[in-house]
Structure formats: structure tokens, C-alpha cells
Amino acid sequence: MAKSQIEPGVPITLQELYPSSLFYKEGVSLRVTAMLRGYSVETAIGVIEDGGRSLKINTQNIRDVSFRVGSIYQFIGELHIEQPNNEAILQARTGRNVDGIDMNLYRKTIELLRQFLKEEDNSNMVE
């Protein structure tokens, strides 16, 4: 029997999510943080935006979060690529309001985390 495991959401910026990127794959687990630009209660679909890039978020599995357009949210979930238009939508498994976050500092922490993990991988290969 196949082992079912929930993968951690890889933190990315919306600028890194485009059709030829490593993150633009069906089922990949992602963590995204951006401003909510629109939300439909009827469909539970929101649109987040950061740096001129946007992403649809399906929030049907999220409870106890009230969505306010203009607030900043962080979502963790799996990316689905809708065919035939190759449009990405994140099926969120969790989400939270992170108003007050410094987005420039957040982007920098993502860069530093990747640098650290890369250095750790390299040092582990030497041992």
C-alpha cells in the first residue's frame, strides 16, 4: 500500500510561479503570501497578488478564517494546473491573515532560507 504523506509547503514568492518554473507543477505543495485582491463567497475562490503577479486560491477547505480584500494572507496547499489554459490554482489546506508582515523582509528570508539549505546540502555531501 502506498504511503500517503502531506508534504510541507515550499515558501515561494508569486514572482517565482510561472509556467516554466520548477514550482509550476501539478500537486506541488507551496506556501504563498500575498494581498487578497478579490474573493467570492459563493465559489470560495480568492485571488492574491504580489509584485504584479496573481494566483487563484481555492479556500473551500479552510474554516474559521474571514477573508477581507486588501489584507495579506498566507496559504499552504497544493497547486493544480487547469487544462487547457494551463492556469494555476492553489487548493489551500490552511490559511491565515498575516497583516502587518513586512513583505520585503519576508522575501529576503525566503532567499536566506534557500541559501542556508543549499549550504547545508553541500556540507552534508562532503561528510
From Swiss-Prot:
Q: What does UniProt note about where in the body, tissue by tissue, this protein is expressed? A: Ubiquitous. High expression in meristematic tissues and in vasculature.
> Could you name the domain of life of the organism this protein comes from?
Eukaryota
Q: Which GO terms describe its cellular component?
A: chromosome, telomeric region; CST complex
> What Pfam family is a match, any one?
Ten1_2
Q: Where does it live in the cell?
A: Nucleus; Chromosome, Telomere
**Entry's Gene Ontology BP terms:** response to heat; shoot system development; stem cell population maintenance; telomere maintenance
Which UniProt keyword terms apply here? Chromosome, Nucleus, Telomere
> Disulfide connectivity?
none
Has UniProt tagged this entry with the keyword tRNA-binding? Answer: no
Q: What does the annotation give as the result of altering residue 77 to E? A: In mdo1-1/ten1-3; strong developmental defects and loss of in vitro interaction with STN1
Protein family (similarity comment): Belongs to the TEN1 family.
Q: Quote the subunit structure annotation.
A: Component of the CST complex, composed of CTC1, TEN1 and STN1. Interacts with STN1. No interaction with POT1A, but competes with it for STN1 binding.
The function of this protein is: Required for the maintenance of meristems and stem cells through the reduction of DNA damage. Promotes telomere integrity by maintaining telomere length and proper architecture of the chromosome terminus. Negatively regulates telomerase repeat addition processivity. Hampers contacts between enzymatically active telomerase and CST complex.
Q: What is this protein called?
A: CST complex subunit TEN1
